[in-house]
Amino acid sequence: MSIDSELQATIDALVQDGKGLLAADESGPTIAKRFKTIAVESTEENRRAWRSLLLSTPGLGEFISGVILYEETLGQRADDGTPLPELAERQQIVPGIKVDTGKIPLAHAPGDEITQGLDGLAIRVDRYKQQGARFAKWRAVYNVSDTLPSRLAIEANAESLARYAAICQEAGVVPIVEPEVLIDGDHSIARCAAVTDAVLHAVFDALHRHRVLLAHMLLKPSMVVPGKEHAAQPAPAEVADATVRLLRGVVPAEVPGIFFLSGGQTPEEATANLDAMNRLSGRPWLLSFSYGRALQEPPLAAWKGQAANVRDAQQALLLRARLNGAACRGRYDAAMERAA
């Protein structure tokens, strides 16, 4: 199979109506914080048990087309010895991999950050592909204030995202490009929109320079929302209007799918906002989800680190996946939360 055919086959498998992505690629420190909320120690065995629980959830493939894994998970096995990526594949869920190595302060740019991981990336992507990964993810983050992010941070992160995407496509691995405008702070929805617009323009300029094929990549942006400390929190219809209006002006129609991150929203908020977007007309791309905490928070609370709670946790995950699947079609209703 040619590289182009390989990339297209992965896009076709990921971009499906009513399905989204499960982001299970938390770094060591992040998953330790999540486990702390349920008083569970972040050991290798507990992480393996948790991710095995997620990927073995019966029926998950009806609403989830792909899962983003952390490097550790590629080599882990379920209790019966099945490699965890294979658990996903059994439900036609495509395994993917987070390939960046985290963020550091950007030199000479106080308050801004830059993502690392380009050194040796081509070699790592080839290895991950041999382990079963068919797509990858790289996250850039942008802190927001009256003066942040700087132009330097916007351009430096766009360049890194584009270089990563080009390296992945050369290897036959679909890149997910994730520019996250952070929800931290008290900025307005208008400020978020202005920053997101500048960020996405820079990202697509860089993708063009690096000859990234837009038809063979996916975008994972944040929604246009105010900072979580802002006094006025908008209704889903306002978030949807602001987000889709901005995307129409920036994201080329060749991009096959936009998979939103939840970025600190509650599970219910993330679902309602996605649903509101899918009720709007004039969307050339599929609008879906790539949620981490917004999918995992309810099952994590149900699990509590206890094997006896696995079934309850899996039912909680399946419910959130089902509700987000409905939101992908513009058919979600808050009453569905209460009926569950």
Where are these regions (language model features)?
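Helix-rich catalytic cores of soluble enzyme domains
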Residues: 121-206
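Hydrophobic residues within beta-strands of alpha/beta enzymes
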Residues: 67, 136, 175-176, 217, ...
